[in-house]
């Protein structure tokens, strides 16, 4: 006997069958190959941007600093000075370019004696990252050599192959020691200093200490200078060109943690009030770390302290060239600017 099924039961069974039926899957939408590669490229760039500063910090000392000729510096010798007990600093001495043939194969004693040949001498004090092999530092040494000057580029304690830990008194001690070492061998030659970035703070610290000892540099060049270590970070974070860089996590570690962790102050602003040595300030208008307004303030302080328009000069470089913080050595006008400054020291 057949079971009778009424209409209401048929409707119920149909509804239950519909609920139990699997929902049809939507067709897979495949992303265009162009968009996939664009995403991969963008992610790769972000990773590189975040990690390159960190890698540079970690691997900045892998160069063989004992062989400056392999790094683009001919007629240059590498040597070491013991600035105090337990501290040995590495130094490169590049002689004037016109002596390059004579310098081939010579030892440290020959280079020391060469300091008394009457040519102007520059001590170069670099910034707070890397070592003396950085391209812009080699570039400055080559410019000075081409002008007929001696260039001595030192790695402070804790930098490059120098021993010890970097502290403000320690870096200043290293610079004072190098000055005294050069002065003993320089005869009547001019002895000037070129401080870049953090090196400007070491420069002014050293200049003040030398004044207390009755000594002084014959001329000072400050490039990309900070007013002081204690306000440098704030100045940089407020700079309109730096918004992009601070998106990457290692920038602060790479640039300012060395100053913060080692309590580096370097009161350039206060030091300038005491210095009476001729000063030339070099600054790029597009410096992405130190705004041009800092250079203008340094110029104002130094000019007021020395009460002279002739003994303090500010040389701005057009931002359209893209020199940023480290690239002034590429400007074709720089050698003549430096030459005129040195000539003014003996006028």
Where are these regions (language model features)?
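Gly/Ala-rich beta-loop-alpha elbow adjacent to hydrolase catalytic centers
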Residues: 195-199, 203
């Amino acid at each position: 006997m057949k079971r009778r099924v009424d209409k209401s039961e048929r409707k119920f069974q149909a509804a239950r069958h519909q609920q139990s039926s699997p929902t049809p899957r939507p067709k897979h939408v495949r992303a265009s190959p162009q968009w996939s590669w664009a995403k991969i490229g963008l992610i790769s760039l972000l990773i590189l941007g975040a990690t390159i500063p960190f890698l540079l910090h970690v691997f900045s000392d892998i160069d063989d600093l004992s062989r400056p000729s392999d790094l683009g510096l001919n007629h240059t010798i590498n040597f070491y000075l013991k600035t105090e007990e337990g501290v040995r600093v590495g130094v490169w001495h590049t002689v004037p370019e016109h002596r390059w043939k004579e310098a081939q194969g010579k030892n440290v004693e020959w280079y020391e004696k060469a300091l008394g040949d009457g040519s102007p001498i520059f001590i170069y004090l670099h910034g707070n990252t890397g070592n003396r092999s950085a391209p812009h530092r080699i570039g400055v040494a080559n410019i000075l050599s081409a002008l007929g000057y001696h260039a001595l580029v030192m790695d402070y304690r804790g930098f490059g192959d120098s021993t010890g830990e970097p502290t403000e008194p320690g870096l200043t001690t290293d610079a004072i020691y190098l000055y005294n070492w050069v002065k003993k061998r320089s005869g009547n030659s001019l002895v000037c200093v070129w401080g870049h970035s953090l090196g400007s703070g070491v420069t002014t610290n050293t200049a003040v200490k030398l004044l207390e000892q009755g000594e002084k540099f014959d001329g000072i060049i400050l490039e990309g200078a900070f007013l002081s270590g204690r306000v440098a970070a704030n100045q940089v974070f407020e700079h309109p060109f730096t918004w992009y860089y601070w998106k990457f996590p290692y920038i602060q570690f790479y640039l300012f943690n060395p100053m913060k962790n080692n309590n580096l102050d370097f009161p350039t602003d206060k030091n300038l009030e005491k210095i009476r040595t001729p000063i030339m300030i070099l600054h790029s208008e597009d410096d992405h770390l130190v705004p041009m307004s800092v250079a203008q303030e340094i110029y104002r302080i130094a000019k007021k302290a020395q009460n002279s328009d002739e003994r303090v000069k500010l040389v701005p470089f057009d931002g359209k060239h893209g020199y940023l913080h480290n690239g002034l050595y590429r400007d074709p006008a720089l050698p003549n600017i430096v030459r005129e400054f040195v000539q003014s020291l003996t006028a």
